A protein has these predicted regions:
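Conserved, well-structured functional cores that handle cations and Mg-NTP chemistry
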Residues: 1-152, 157-174, 191
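An anionic, glycine-rich sequence signature occurring as long contiguous blocks
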Residues: 77, 96-120, 124, 128, ...
Length: 237
């Protein structure tokens, strides 16, 4: 059962006060705090927001931290010794905040090395999961917890995953992830690439929106809508 907004805010204030006087006998439960803070965030930001899946890298010097290995980090813009975390954020016109997180464990260097996992404090039952699989676990969990999102967004890593799309379709949840330009879709009964669909959109049907500040200034994107895959059995995709 979800707490009321006032009850959550009162509990949040009590947790904040308790944080000023640490209890040495208390057990840290990151998931419980995530759930409590998540409820507080949604109460403050309001319903009908967007769930956003994305990953970020944490550059490391050593090799002992859980999940660390040489891999591409978007944060660094190159291959680095780093950890990768997959995050779920919630955004509305009132603001944005993180709701959940999962640590990505590279298959061959972590789940396949139980001694290394034990040394880093990784639970023995943890199995390998792709980044989209981590997202597929987080999004339904947030919705089941009562997050009243209207749609889900993410980059191409997540947009190309059929399981994540299937889960969202089953829940009749709108989604606008990035996909590869060569992805095949059905347009008026003809199979074409996503890039070809974009070429059919005239300038007058494109709407430019700013997506925050980038390293080289404001990031502007042109948006348009096209009806694709209309023959899906449930008419929803």
């Amino acid at each position: 059962m979800r707490s009321t907004g006032s009850a959550r805010r009162a509990r949040w204030r009590s947790h904040h006060d308790a944080g000023l006087r640490p209890d040495r006998g208390a057990r840290w439960d990151a998931d419980a705090i995530r759930d409590d803070v998540g409820g507080f965030v949604v109460d403050r930001l309001g319903p009908d927001g967007v769930l956003i899946v994305d990953e970020t890298g944490f550059v490391k010097k050593g090799t002992g931290s859980a999940g660390v290995q040489r891999q591409y980090s978007g944060t660094a813009g190159r291959i680095e010794t780093c950890q990768i975390g997959v995050f779920l954020a919630y955004a509305t016109p009132a603001g944005r905040a993180l709701l959940d997180r999962r640590l990505y464990l590279p298959a061959h260097t972590w789940p396949a090395a139980p001694e290394r996992c034990q040394a880093a404090g990784v639970p023995g039952e943890i199995a390998f999961a792709t980044k989209p699989a981590l997202a597929t676990a987080m999004v339904p969990a947030a919705l089941n917890a009562g997050v009243l999102a209207r749609w889900v967004s993410g980059d191409e890593v997540y947009g190309q995953d059929p399981r994540l799309r299937a889960v969202l379709q089953e829940r009749r949840m709108g989604y606008v992830p990035a996909i590869a330009g060569n992805r095949r879709v059905d347009l008026d009964g003809v199979q074409v690439s996503a890039a070809e669909v974009a070429t059919h959109v005239t300038d007058r049907h494109r709407h430019r929106h700013r997506a925050g500040q980038g390293a080289k200034g404001p990031r502007w994107y042109a948006w348009a809508r096209a009806r694709i895959d209309q023959d899906e059995p449930d008419g929803y995709r």
